[in-house]
């Protein structure tokens, strides 16, 4: 060893004597050392499956660093699990390196070290550090969105809307993605590879006359949701039915590079574009109005995607001009400005603010910035809730093209005009009036209905002129070459188009109030001006069109549209908690809470028999009596009602987080029972229509996914819901006669409009829903014209409606048709003598709560003796049980079933039922004795032999907390679990407990109802 050291020392001395050129020699003989560990190491959990690690380069590495290796392993894991490593190449330009380690287990602690490596090999490991990934609960993706709603716009376009799912997961939703499938051709879903920021869109470029289904996914920072429930299958129109007319403003687009193809399940060679819809903040509850913004995307080349360049907001001078000869700024009733925004430059040089778009104005020259549908104000920044659209001469609203109308159509329009000229309606083969079209215009205060089947125009002019500022109704009808115009139900005017062609091709949208190309339509329609005024209603081919913006209504787009009813409630004075709402363009009603009525809710009243009116938007609400789990698999409703209209909702409830619902509706005079367990809707419809103005009884029941409907004495209708789910959960109230918001109802519920008529009885699972006590909210519910409203029952008696008649339920001590007789005119202290033998009428009862009585009908032994007579086969003689009754609750009962006497009891481990067969409803007096000793029971009737029985299980005591009832009880079916449906019809003369405890039936009773005096002993 000393020899080696000496040699090395000599070599070093030699190298130093050789000068700088010997440095390489010194390096060659130096022994290389390990690279030190990286510095400033930082760890952090990113989500439930990844963490980040950051470090800096080691100081004074002995040799150049080539890269790094991250070593990580689970803390406390099985030693058989190998340590994992992750290599990171060196980035020379960045002193600090950061890396993400993924594909980890949620909520798991990891031990992490890092080492640099060089030509000399692996460097020294850093000290181990620990990091724990986030728990699974904090990294949840969103729930699947609700089933999308699809409207077919044309032969190549559809409009989609959807609502978010029950949960957005552990992070806000970032965007949505849309997928589609053609069921007749495709086996896989095709993804539209674009991030949709809104909850509505329009897809273009689809195949004509083809079936499609659509689904939606939501994405947050933790991943995508499951695919939504697919939409219903829709079919695009045939080219002959409708075209793909442009119905939205044009936008500047820029062809840019798209994102990569990840996420595509199938790529078809389709050229599909879509239009994303922008929400308007004024709409609450997730239902959003929109404007259409064009984008294009070629699915055959997903990397090439059209991107929208949003309009630039700028402070530009606005020219306000007068109608003659210059246009001016106009305002709606609420003062929201509908600006002309006219500029003396073409659209190529004009910048419009957000929520507006530019059109060239050929009438005045220059260009105009128009607000999109649902926006107004000087910069189009104010929200306008549109229900009754208001037009200003350059406005318009678009709807889908006329469908199934090429041979015949009928259109009804109610409007109020403020100018002598203007275009009301237009739909045609193209935007410029060449070829096929139909139009309705006001020309010098006359209405002109024009249509062209391709070979000549028909012009039909109203015989009378309209009155400016007044409301008018016009009906247009065409069948082939022949047309008809009727104004205000006056004498129809007819006309005929020229030539032989009798069909019209409609490709453009249906324009209301004007058109974007109105200037070029003058030769076809007779005017180049837009309509000025309000439209209150529009119906096409018998179907009323909801003029609100899609997806709430059917309006697809529009420009510079106001709201006619705006400000109408500013001067309204609804009191007692009432709220104002517009019901027409120029009128309002107060939505009065329960117990108040009148134009301004000024009249207080007591609700007895509810009357609902569609015109007043009536409804009432009551909570479910029990928790939702009590109704998951079975529910039954009995309703007695009198309809004044053949359409409307009787009852509705639903679940906000799923597809579950149930509804009872009138549709075309028939009763419909609809329900959905979450996998498909069942629809049961009565065979015969109802007679309006008459009282009817209906019963609906659902067991799992099977339903039953019976109306009056009609044939019972049975049906089944689709799919495999069998339970319904409803977390909303039960809505009766209407609902607060018809936009929130389930799509297949059939709930379209309020009920008009009266409802006098609602029973749910044998439990009566009382109007006075159970209705918790509602609006504009008044009293029906019924005798019970006048409170005809005296002395505290309650009126029980029986269709158009009634019965009085009299308190103990009173009798008569109206409870007007007091103990048969005896004094109060002689009630006992007057009603020594009480008579029961099937809805009577006597109640006892004296502890000396109750202890004899409980415990280990019971002995009951009773003398009775009856003419009814069924009826309850005696009952004591828990209140409320639960499964396997203790009870003891005595009664008649189909003429036989039945003694039943349950000690908590099963029911004993001991029967004596016979016909004891013969109107004669009978003696019955029922004895229980522990589990054993015996019943004896008259001189018949005794019948015995024994309850199952081990329980021997009768433990009851309820009162004792004789002859019947309140809500008998509910409280006896349907063992008995009515009380005794007859008399009871003797009642003895424990062989020697005689009870005075009336004197000892604490309460009773409908007790009369029995005629003979």
From Swiss-Prot:
GO molecular function list: calcium ion binding; glycosaminoglycan binding
Disulfide partners: 347-358, 352-369, 371-380, 534-564, 569-580, 574-590, 592-601, 788-799, 793-808, 810-819, 987-1014
Predominant location: secreted
One biological process term in Gene Ontology: extracellular matrix organization
Pfam families named in the record: EGF, EGF_Pikachurin, fn3, Laminin_G_1, Laminin_G_2
Glycosylation sites: 47
GO cellular component, one term: synaptic cleft
Domain Fibronectin type-III: 37-136, 144-239
Protein localization: Secreted, Extracellular space, Extracellular matrix; Synaptic cleft; Presynaptic active zone
Domain Laminin G-like: 386-564, 609-788, 835-1014
Signal peptide residue numbers: 1-24
Keyword terms of this UniProt record: Cell projection, Disulfide bond, EGF-like domain, Extracellular matrix, Glycoprotein, Heparan sulfate, Proteoglycan, Repeat, Secreted, Signal, Synapse
Sequence ranges assigned to domain EGF-like in this UniProt record: 343-381, 565-602, 784-820
Protein's job: Involved in both the retinal photoreceptor ribbon synapse formation and physiological functions of visual perception. Plays a key role in the synaptic organization of photoreceptors by mediating transsynaptic interaction between alpha-dystroglycan and GPR179 on the postsynaptic membrane. Necessary for proper bipolar dendritic tip apposition to the photoreceptor ribbon synapse. Promotes matrix assembly and cell adhesiveness.
Quaternary structure and interacting proteins, as annotated: Interacts with DAG1 alpha-dystroglycan. Interacts with GPR158 and GPR179; transsynaptic interaction is required for synaptic organization of photoreceptor cells.
Name this protein carries in UniProt: Pikachurin
Gene: EGFLAM
């Amino acid at each position: 060893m000393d020899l080696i050291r000496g040699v090395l020392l000599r070599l070093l001395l030699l190298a130093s004597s050789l000068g700088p050129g010997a440095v390489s020699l010194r390096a060659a003989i130096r022994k290389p050392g390990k690279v030190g560990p990286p510095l400033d190491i930082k760890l952090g959990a990113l989500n439930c499956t990844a963490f980040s690690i950051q470090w800096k380069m080691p100081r004074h590495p002995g040799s150049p660093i080539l890269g790094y290796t991250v070593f990580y392993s689970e803390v406390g894991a099985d030693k058989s699990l190998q340590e994992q490593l992750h290599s990171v190449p060196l980035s020379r330009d960045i002193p600090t390196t950061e890396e993400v380690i993924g594909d980890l287990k949620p909520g798991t602690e990891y031990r992490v070290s890092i080492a640099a490596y060089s030509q000399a090999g692996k460097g020294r490991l850093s000290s181990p550090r620990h990091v724990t990934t986030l728990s699974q609960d904090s990294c949840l993706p969103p729930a699947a969105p609700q089933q999308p709603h699809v409207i077919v716009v044309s032969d190549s376009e559809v409009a989609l809307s959807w609502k978010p799912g029950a949960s957005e997961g552990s992070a806000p939703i970032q965007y949505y993605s849309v997928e589609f499938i053609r069921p007749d051709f495709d086996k896989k879903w095709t993804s539209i590879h674009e991030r949709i920021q809104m909850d509505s869109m329009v897809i273009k470029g689809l195949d004509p006359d083809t079936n499609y289904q659509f689904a939606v996914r939501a994405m947050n920072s933790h991943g995508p949701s499951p695919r939504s429930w697919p939409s219903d299958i829709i079919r695009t129109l045939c080219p002959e039915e409708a075209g793909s007319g442009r119905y939205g403003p044009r936008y500047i687009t820029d062809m840019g590079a798209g994102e990569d193809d990840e996420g595509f399940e199938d790529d078809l060679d389709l050229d599909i574009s879509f239009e994303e819809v922008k929400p308007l903040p004024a709409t609450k509850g997730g239902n959003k109005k929109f404007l259409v913004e064009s984008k294009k995307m070629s699915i055959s080349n997903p990397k090439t995607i059209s991107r929208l360049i949003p309009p630039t907001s700028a402070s530009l001078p606005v020219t306000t001009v007068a109608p003659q000869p210059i246009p001016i700024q106009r305002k709606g009733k609420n003062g929201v400005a509908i600006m002309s925004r006219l500029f003396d430059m073409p659209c190529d040089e004009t910048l419009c603010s957000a929520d507006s778009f530019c059109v060239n104005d050929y009438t005045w020259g220059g260009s105009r910035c128009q607000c999109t549908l649902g926006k107004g104000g000087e910069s189009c920044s104010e929200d306008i809730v549109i229900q009754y659209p208001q037009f200003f001469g350059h406005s318009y609203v678009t709807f889908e093209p006329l469908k199934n109308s090429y041979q015949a159509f009928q259109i009804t329009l109610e409007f109020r005009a403020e100018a002598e000229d203007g275009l009301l309606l237009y739909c045609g083969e193209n935007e410029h009036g060449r070829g096929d079209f139909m139009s309705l215009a006001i020309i010098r205060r006359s209405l002109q209905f024009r249509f062209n089947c391709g070979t000549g125009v028909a012009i039909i002019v109203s015989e009378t002129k309209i009155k400016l500022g007044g409301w008018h109704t016009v009906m247009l009808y065409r069948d082939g070459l022949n047309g008809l115009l009727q104004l205000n139900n006056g004498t129809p005017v007819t006309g005929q188009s020229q030539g032989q062609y009798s069909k019209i091709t409609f490709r453009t949208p249906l324009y209301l109030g004007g058109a974007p190309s109105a200037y070029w339509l003058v030769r076809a329609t007779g005017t180049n001006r837009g309509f000025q005024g309000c439209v209150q209603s529009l119906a096409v081919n018998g179907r009323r069109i909801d003029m609100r913006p899609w997806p709430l209504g059917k309006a697809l787009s529009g420009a510079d549209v106001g709201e006619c009813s705006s400000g109408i409630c500013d001067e309204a004075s609804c009191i007692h908690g009432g709220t104002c709402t517009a019901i027409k363009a120029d009128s309002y009603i107060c939505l009065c809470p329960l117990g108040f009525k009148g134009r301004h809710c000024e009249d207080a009243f007591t609700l007895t028999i509810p009357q609902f009116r569609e015109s007043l938007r009536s409804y009432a609400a009551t909570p479910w009596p029990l928790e939702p789990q009590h109704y998951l698999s079975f529910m039954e409703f009995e309703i007695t009602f009198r309809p004044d209209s053949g359409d409307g909702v009787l009852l509705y409830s639903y679940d906000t987080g799923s597809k579950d619902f149930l509804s009872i509706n009138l549709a075309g005079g028939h009763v419909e029972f609809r329900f959905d367990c979450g996998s498909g809707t069942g629809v049961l419809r009565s065979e015969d229509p109802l007679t309006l103005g008459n009282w009817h009884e209906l019963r609906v029941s659902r067991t799992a996914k099977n339903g039953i409907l019976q109306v009056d004495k009609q044939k019972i209708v049975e049906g089944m819901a689709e799919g495999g789910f069998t339970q319904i959960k409803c977390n909303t109230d039960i809505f009766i006669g209407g609902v607060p918001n018809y936009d929130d109802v389930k799509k297949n519920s059939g709930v379209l409009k309020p009920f008009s008529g009266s409802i006098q009885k609602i029973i749910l699972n044998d439990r009566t829903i009382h109007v006075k006590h159970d209705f918790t909210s509602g609006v504009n519910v008044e009293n029906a014209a019924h005798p019970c409203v006048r409170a005809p029952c005296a002395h505290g008696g309650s009126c029980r409606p029986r269709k158009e008649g009634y019965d009085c339920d009299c308190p103990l001590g009173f009798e008569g048709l109206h409870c007007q007789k007091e103990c048969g005119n005896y004094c109060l202290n002689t009630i006992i003598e007057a009603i020594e033998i009480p008579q029961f009428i099937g809805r009577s009862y006597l109640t006892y709560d004296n502890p000396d009585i109750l202890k004899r009908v409980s415990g280990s032994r019971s002995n009951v003796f009773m003398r009775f007579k009856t003419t009814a086969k069924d009826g309850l003689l005696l009952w004591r049980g828990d209140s409320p009754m639960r499964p396997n609750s203790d009870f003891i009962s005595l009664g008649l079933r189909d003429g036989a006497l039945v003694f039943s009891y349950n000690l908590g481990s099963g029911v004993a039922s001991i029967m004596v067969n016979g016909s004891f409803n013969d109107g004669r007096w009978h003696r019955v004795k029922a004895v229980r000793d522990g589990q054993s029971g015996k019943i004896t009737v008259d001189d018949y032999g005794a019948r015995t029985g024994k309850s199952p299980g081990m329980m021997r005591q009768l433990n009851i907390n309820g009162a004792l009832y004789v002859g019947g009880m309140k809500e008998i079916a509910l409280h006896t679990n349907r063992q008995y449906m009515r009380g005794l019809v007859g008399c009871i003369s003797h009642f003895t407990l424990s062989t020697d405890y005689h009870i005075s039936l009336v004197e000892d009773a604490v309460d009773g109802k409908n007790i009369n005096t029995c005629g003979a002993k």
